[in-house]
Amino acid sequence: MSSDIKAAFFDIDGTLTSFVTHVVPRSTIDALHALQKKDVKVFICSGRAPSYMGVVLDTIPVEFDGIVGLNGQFCTTRDGLDYRHPIDLHDVEIITDWLQSHTDVVANYAESNYGYFNRINAALERTWNSLGETAPKIDICNPRQRIGNHRTFQISPYVDKATEAEIAGMCGNVRGVR
């Protein structure tokens, strides 16, 4: 009897990798291989940008069938499906202007194959350190140097929910996701 399950989707942080050990257990790798032997396609589904996934995926001896990255804004499969939905440039400019006038706020900008921060502070360092070996490299860049020539898929300011709502309210096509 064949299985009705055709695909399985797995998050990286806290699902495939432990928040404690920052590694993928052997039992998880074996389970992923068992799914593939049953012709179940195995996908990564993450809020991470593709450029931030390699530090984890390179340690997992599994060939994934595709990724759903950036909370669904970037999807690709080995079969050639490619879906990309960047943030409207006008909204990126509004958020960038807000961030430039709030110099205490750190934000991560995610492009399809590059991620960077507008600045660094102690809170960012603590968050990144909590990821252990699964933490991607931190690059610092002035967003104004990139947003006009590179599509931005996600901007993650390190703010509370009320400030997030304020920022999203200034934009026409943006909503906060936590």
Feature annotation, model-predicted:
Residues 1-3, 54-59, 170:
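Short amphipathic alpha-helices and their capping/turn segments at secondary-structure boundaries
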Residues 4-21, 95:
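Asp-based phosphoryl-transfer active-site loop
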Residues 9-11, 74-76, 146-149:
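Short, basic/glycine-rich phosphate-binding loops at helix/coil junctions
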Residues 12, 80, 151-155:
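Short amphipathic alpha-helical segments
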Residues 24-26:
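A short acidic/small-residue loop/turn micro-motif
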Residues 28-126:
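Active-site phosphate-binding/coordination module
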Residues 105-106, 110-178:
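Conserved acidic, metal-coordinating active-site core of Asp-based
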